[in-house]
Amino acid sequence: MPRRRVIGQRKILPDPKFGSELLAKFVNILMVDGKKSTAEAIVYTALETLAQRSGKDHLEAFEVALDNVRPTVEVKSRRVGGSTYQVPVEVRPVRRNALAMRWIVDAARKRGDKSMALRLANELSDAVENKGSAVKKREDVHRMAEANKAFAHYRW
């Protein structure tokens, strides 16, 4: 293993329309085959729809949706004496955002609406109202962590 300096994380450029780094990251997660302009168009259309529905500012509604999907704890597998335990660990802030965005995009892709922009808008509006697949995913992860709280002392 090389012992050179640790390379820092790349700085992500904020998105051009709203100037938000979170939104730029979200666009990158949604992007398929390097088609960034298509991903941006989908996200901006979805945010327009979301803002009209919720009556909030675009970014504010997006933040609320993300907040409702962010996990605080998750489980990680840990081998102890030949058996594997699901150990609950706290999620780092950067990973919280990444997981929330990934779950929202995955849930939107699984929906049956016409366009991706509409699917994303519906999933985001569900997340704002604390319902939908992405919120259910977070609750499942929290439930797993709660069920395995007895193994918390195996944290590393």
UniProtKB/Swiss-Prot annotation:
InterPro entries in the record: Ribosomal_uS7 (IPR000235), Ribosomal_uS7_bac/org-type (IPR005717), Ribosomal_uS7_CS (IPR020606), Ribosomal_uS7_dom (IPR023798), Ribosomal_uS7_dom_sf (IPR036823)
BP term (GO), one: translation
One cellular-component annotation, GO: small ribosomal subunit
UniProt keyword list: Ribonucleoprotein, Ribosomal protein, RNA-binding, rRNA-binding, tRNA-binding
Domain of life: Bacteria
Database matches in SUPFAM superfamilies: Ribosomal protein S7
One Pfam family, short name: Ribosomal_S7
UniProt GO molecular function: rRNA binding; structural constituent of ribosome; tRNA binding
Function, as annotated: One of the primary rRNA binding proteins, it binds directly to 16S rRNA where it nucleates assembly of the head domain of the 30S subunit. Is located at the subunit interface close to the decoding center, probably blocks exit of the E-site tRNA.
Cited NCBIfam families: rpsG_bact (TIGR01029)
Assembly with partners or alone: Part of the 30S ribosomal subunit. Contacts proteins S9 and S11.
PANTHER family in the cross-refs: RIBOSOMAL PROTEIN S7 (PTHR11205)
Stated family: Belongs to the universal ribosomal protein uS7 family.
Protein name: Small ribosomal subunit protein uS7
Gene for this chain: rpsG
